[in-house]
């Protein structure tokens, strides 16, 4: 098990069922040292108001030895790469994930989906693209991987895509992992937990990256230091409290 999980949802996204405290408790039990809460961006029907993300600045950085990153899973809105993260939200957030979600950006043809994803990557506003292997949104995988490597954006292998949602993602995700490997980019693993009990569960995602011999030194979840170093390379001010992780 890797000690970092970068994608999960709380009751603030009302189709999820756990609180921040629930995740902290599970992290302690499972040996997770750092995680990011990434509730859905405000353009989703059941997402929190944008004030929710602004006020994440009041969260403690560490609770009982577990580090907490303040994140969002924003929605890619259009082919210009616009996402539903704006204004003061950026000041409070450490980690910005963005991806396609049908209520906000309906599936299009391969060229349109690719244009939207690459524009989002090139915007400089996003750290990770969530579930890029979703078969409902065909993309030019190599073009996306090369853009992601160029702009220091990680592509996610989402464990939930093989269990609960986005059925048929396996082949695309293997292709994503292989393309990122060849482009020299970063992979992020995400449990995409909607209940704290699945925090840190990457078993199916690990099968994907192992199948393509993906190098461990390009996986963000290997340690808190690696993930924090990645964020700092993207401009995040070092967070003093995390030095003890």
Swiss-Prot record:
Residues involved in Zn(2+) 1 binding: 7, 9, 73, 192
GO molecular function, one term: zinc ion binding
Binding site for Zn(2+) 2: 15, 40, 194
Matching CDD domains: PHP_HisPPase_Ycdx_like
Any one of the GO CC terms: cytosol
Keyword DNA-binding among record annotations: no
Cofactor(s) needed by this chain: Zn(2+)
EC number: 3.1.3.-
Record text on cofactor binding: Binds 3 Zn(2+) ions per subunit.
Oligomer and partners: Homotrimer.
NCBIfam families: PRK09248.1 (NF006702)
PANTHER family: PHOSPHATASE YCDX-RELATED (PTHR36928:SF1)
Similarity comment: Belongs to the PHP family.
Name by which UniProt lists this protein: Probable phosphatase YcdX
Annotated source species: Escherichia fergusonii (strain ATCC 35469 / DSM 13698 / CCUG 18766 / IAM 14443 / JCM 21226 / LMG 7866 / NBRC 102419 / NCTC 12128 / CDC 0568-73)
